[in-house]
Structures are given as C-alpha cells and as structure tokens.
Amino acid sequence: MDALLTSPFIPLKKPSHNRKSNTTTASSSSSSFLQLIPQTKKETLDFDLPRYNTLISPTLDLAVVGGGPAGLAVAKRVSDAGLSVCSIDPYPNLVWPNNYGVWVDEFAAMDLLDCIDASWNSASVFIDDNNRKLLSRPYARVDRRRLKSRLLNAYLSNGVRFHQSKVLNVVHEEAKSVLLCSDGTRIPAAVVLDATGFSRCLVQYQQPYNPGYQVAYGILAEVEEHPFELDQMVFMDWRDSHLGFRPELKKRNDGLPTFLYAMPFSSDLIFLEETSLVARPGLLIEDIQERMIERLRHLGIRIKRIEEDERCVIPMGGPLPVLPQRVLGIGGTAGMVHPSTGYMVARTLAAAPIVADAIVGYIGGSGAEVSARVWKDLWPIERRRQREFFCFGMDVLLKLDLEGTRRFFDAFFGLEERYWHGFLSSRLFLPELVGFGFSLFGRASAGCRLEIMAKGTVPLIKMIRNLLKDLE
C-alpha cells in the first residue's frame, strides 16, 4: 500500500476536446445513442516529415513498417545512436485512434508522465451489486497527440525518413532485405521491423493461430450527467442488474460476460467502454453494443454528443511467431499482448529499448545472425515462461461464466498488491507467478477453488508440457 501511495500522481485535469461536431446535440436516450455516432474523423499532426528519397536509395540500417507507439519508439532510439532509419506507414501524420489507459507507475518508470492528459488517484472494481473493491493505484489516459509528437520531434532531430505507403512483401538477401511497397517503391534495409500490430504484415507464424479475442466498444461522450466519482476510474464493472428485464440478453451475459470500463473526465464528459475480456470466438460488436445500451439506460446516463467511438478486436494468446526469423517484430505482431488481460501499450513501450539496443549492438553481421540475436533478447526464456503462465490464465478465464469470473476477480483483487500489480504489468516471472498462483488459490472461495481445479487442470497440463518443450 505504501509503495502505491507514493507513486507519482498527476492531478485530474479535463483534457481538451473539440466540441464541434456535425451530429445533433440533442439529448439522446440510451437506446438511441448509437444514432449520435459521428462520421469517422481522422485527426492529423502538423509535421513536415522528411521523405525517403526513392531515387537515391542506399541500404538503410533499419526500416520500420507501421507507425504505432512501439514501432516509433524503436525507430527513435535506433536513430539516437546515429543509424539510418526509415518509417513506412500509409498515414504517418495520423493521430492514433484508440484511447490508451495505463497505470501511472508504468509511465513514470519510462519517464513518460508528460504524455498523460488525465489521471485518477484510484480505480474501482464492481464484482457485483454488493461487492466493490477500491484499488489505490493511480491510473491515467495516454495523451496520444503528445506522445506521438514527442517521438516525431525526435525523428526530425535524428534525420529519420518517412515513406507514405503500405508494405506488401519483403525479399531477403544475405546482408539486407528489400521491402516492396504498394506504390512500387523498393526499400532496402539491413534490418526490418514489423510493427503493424495485429495485421502481422510480415512476421510469420507456423503453428495454427487460434487465439482468444478481447472485443470492446467504446465512446467518448458528452452526457447530461453520470453516477461516477471524478477522482476514480472504473476498471471493471461486472454488475448485471441492468439486464433484469432482458432475459435473453442476461442469459447470454451469464455465459459470456462483459464489463464496463469508464474514465470520467468531468461531470459531463466521460469515456465508456463495454468489454468482453476474452472469448473464443470473440463476441460480435453488435452484441456488446446492445448490452452497453441497457447498462447506460440503467445507470441513467443520457448521451448528448458522441465525440469519438472505437471498436477493438484484440487477439490474445496463441503461439509466438517463428523464432527466430529475418523480420523482427514488436507489439501485437510479436505476440506481446498480455494473454490474460489484453494489455500491451506499456509493455511494448518498455520493450522498445531492448529491441533498439539489440539492433544497434548486433548490426553488421549477416541478416539472419542479427535477427536471431534480437529475437533472443526480445523473447528470452524467462519471458517465454511468463507468457505460458499468462496463456494458462487466459485458458482458465475462457471457461468461466459470469459467476465464475466474479469469484475469480474477487480473489484476484484481494491478493497482496505486489501480486496483482505485477501480474497486470507483466513484472512477475515464473517463480513469482507460482507464488501468485498458490496465493490466489488460497485466497479464493471454496467454489472458486473447485472451479479452478475442474476447469484449470487441462490448461495446467498444457502449460507444463509447453514449458518442458521449451527446454529442449
């Protein structure tokens, strides 16, 4: 508790949002708020980015495919070391569309507190109508404009080049790889990094890819009012009293539950997201929207304007990419999504220096040698073992209905903070995770223990088998 309370805290401030919209500003009942969804607005940053010269094309040290946070962070650090870098993306000036939430201590550890635009000194978890847990761990929303602007400013100082196109394929030679772009451009580079996220543009997978899916629908909305405290965000709300008069919807939610995640910025501005934690196959967005409509109606939230809406489909778990391979990966394309939670932003930003420093340190050898060394640094055995445990957690969660999920999180958030903090932030490794598992089992109710034993035995055997196989 003491460690948490001394974490850096950014006082809550109302972020700047553009209130101009083509949509109606009339209040909407929850049942019709989807009518207020604005047309997709693509916000761009005003940077004059230096372009890659297609006429003079010496082999680059690094070509980064994709312009998300992790890819830009790697490119920035590699260019800091004086290496030549090109970032290839169809929309290099575009502001990232999704709202990213992080624990404040995660961004503090990376000296990124200036890239937060709102924060809350605590978070709440509603297990059910009679059980609410208060998490004394500051939480924040990432300032997408500021984070990308910070990285692009460094790019300009370091001489990074940009090419606005989509990469279609890559051809490997012994000492370099050549990227083939949709506009016909060929870009040679000693090292290629695929940072395209879940599209997995270039990174190869051999095993059958059958992940779980986290599916969510969210809105940034101006509302008449909402019932949430302004100094707390809602991390999870598993209550289902809003479905009392919708028996068919309640039955679906009993089997495949969803929860509400909410970030209140002011008394009339809030981000609301209905989320399926993990399911296989993933839930339909329309199903999630229907549940969200009923929840907002029950909470008395009337939407006046929707400023943004987002639809997230996040693959979780599944096999790692082929290790090693010539194309490097980071983030979603490298299997770095937390298989039990869907978290990725802080983890991948923290991994960016590892990948970048490995590239800088190993470049100069053959393409295959460099790639093999970098992949080894990104996925050392302790990280692979950690991921196997997280996949075990995901496999258990896949089998839980609403009541089982409630019992699980009642025990989870009742653990010592070092355990649930470390689990959510990928800071626990296998010996600590074993301790986490025993502690969770000991904390759980009798019903939860029986369920873990009944539904976790097969996933546990699978995890042990994979851990032993990784030693071969």
Curated annotation (Swiss-Prot):
Please provide the record's keywords in A-Z order: Carotenoid biosynthesis, Chloroplast, Isomerase, NAD, Plastid, Transit peptide
Q: Which tissues carry this protein?
A: Expressed in flower buds and lips. Detected in roots and leaves.
**Entry's localization field:** Plastid, Chloroplast
Q: What does the record give under GO molecular function?
A: intramolecular oxidoreductase activity; oxidoreductase activity, acting on paired donors, with incorporation or reduction of molecular oxygen
Question: Could you say which enzyme class this protein belongs to?
Answer: isomerase
Q: Which domain of life is it from?
A: Eukaryota
What this chain does, per the entry, is described as:
Catalyzes the double cyclization reaction which converts lycopene to beta-carotene and neurosporene to beta-zeacarotene.
Kindly provide the name given to this protein in its UniProt entry.
Lycopene beta cyclase, chloroplastic
- The record's gene field reads LCY-B
